[in-house]
């Protein structure tokens, strides 16, 4: 199947950040990111998916952190991961704090779900 895709994409100017060892944004190379589908509390199953994603070319992997068991599991997952781990946070700002304590490389907050200024300040 033939696609008429441009050979070059125009990129918006953005600020570069580091997600673990991977530069993202700015003029950094485009990175591949994916997300696990396991319950993060399943440490071995989640690590198996992370290793498979890394072998397939993922530079960064996101794991959901929607309950305390997931946050606790991240403390065991992060040091064994071959790629930087991003905690995907949904509604509870305390999960973001727990994920940071577990050593994740970055947080992804669903826009608008953490609204109280005190909660935003605690995470920032």
Language model regions located:
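Alpha/beta enzyme core
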Residues: 2-4, 9-63, 67-124
């Amino acid at each position: 199947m033939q696609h008429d895709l441009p050979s070059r994409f125009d990129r918006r100017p953005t600020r570069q950040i580091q997600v673990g060892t991977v530069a993202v944004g700015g003029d950094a190379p485009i990175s591949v990111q994916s997300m696990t589908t396991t319950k993060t509390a399943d440490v071995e199953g989640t690590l198996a998916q992370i290793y498979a994603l890394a072998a397939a070319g993922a530079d960064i992997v996101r794991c959901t952190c929607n309950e305390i068991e997931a946050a606790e599991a991240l403390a065991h997952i992060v040091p064994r991961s071959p790629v930087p781990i991003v905690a995907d946070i949904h509604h509870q700002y305390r999960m973001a704090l727990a994920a940071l304590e577990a050593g994740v490389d970055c947080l992804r907050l669903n826009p608008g779900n953490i609204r109280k200024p005190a909660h935003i300040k605690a995470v920032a």
